[in-house]
Amino acid sequence: MQKQELLYKGKAKSVYETEDNDLLILHFRDDTSALDGKRIEQLARKGVVNNRFNAFIMQKLADAGIETHFEKQLSDDEVLVKRLDMIPVECVVRNFAAGSLVRRLGLEEGQALTPPTYELFYKDDALGDPMVNESISISLGWANDAQLVKMKELSHQVNEVLTALFDAGDLILVDFKLEFGVFHDRIVLGDEFSPDGCRIWDKATKKKLDKDRFRQSLGDVIEAYEEVASRIGVPLS
């Protein structure tokens, strides 16, 4: 499959057309961003680590019966995916309080959330990815009711699969975001799953092993990503 013209350049990935209208190539770059793209740095090995991490997770989800856009890994930093008509909302599942939830509600970081919470955010960096709900999503034509129900159902299924996977590596999956799109009238998981889009803590020490290390200038960002990968069985070589 040959990479053709650039279709879209995001904060950390570039999307390319292919000769097949149903397929795209994602290139994972070393770019790392925070503050809705206002802070961007290059971190060596990040593109390779995230591509391999994502391929591993997507295969685990597919094995559990969750349809994703992942087709196959093409190289160290490229992957072939289905072309989805993306729904412009992020689905956020939280098992423990962290990040914006702590700031909004004055919760203690690490407070257990039982059952896990589920939130929707409109994907727009200029607006700061504001929280929205199903009613707004339907009224503005982003998705219909059946699609939103399916997205919520799949988000909780992903959580069940991945909390068990991370727990086996003595890790806590604190929270994560997912993006979905439509492929031939089906809701399909898109984008990526990597430490860029979730929070992962060491179970014993609560050490942060995700993108918060970059956001909070804690250092050793990629080393933390690689540690998580090693502990859940991601092949990095």
UniProtKB/Swiss-Prot annotation:
GO process annotations (BP): 'de novo' IMP biosynthetic process; cobalamin biosynthetic process
Keyword Ubl conjugation appears in the UniProt entry: no
CDD domains xref list: SAICAR_synt_PurC
GO cellular component, one term: cytosol
Any Pfam family the entry gives: SAICAR_synt
Keyword ATP-binding: yes
Pathway: Purine metabolism; IMP biosynthesis via de novo pathway; 5-amino-1-(5-phospho-D-ribosyl)imidazole-4-carboxamide from 5-amino-1-(5-phospho-D-ribosyl)imidazole-4-carboxylate: step 1/2
Name of the featured protein: Phosphoribosylaminoimidazole-succinocarboxamide synthase
Keyword tags: ATP-binding, Ligase, Nucleotide-binding, Purine biosynthesis
EC code(s) of this entry: 6.3.2.6
InterPro entries named in the record: SAICAR_synt/ADE2_N (IPR028923), SAICAR_synt_PurC (IPR033934), SAICAR_synth (IPR001636), SAICAR_synthetase (IPR050089), SAICAR_synthetase_CS (IPR018236)
Gene3D superfamilies named in the record: ATP-grasp fold, B domain, Phosphorylase Kinase, domain 1
Domain of life: Bacteria
Similarity remark: Belongs to the SAICAR synthetase family.
Catalytic activity annotation: 5-amino-1-(5-phospho-D-ribosyl)imidazole-4-carboxylate + L-aspartate + ATP = (2S)-2-[5-amino-1-(5-phospho-beta-D-ribosyl)imidazole-4-carboxamido]succinate + ADP + phosphate + 2 H(+)
GO molecular-function terms, A-Z: ATP binding; phosphoribosylaminoimidazolesuccinocarboxamide synthase activity
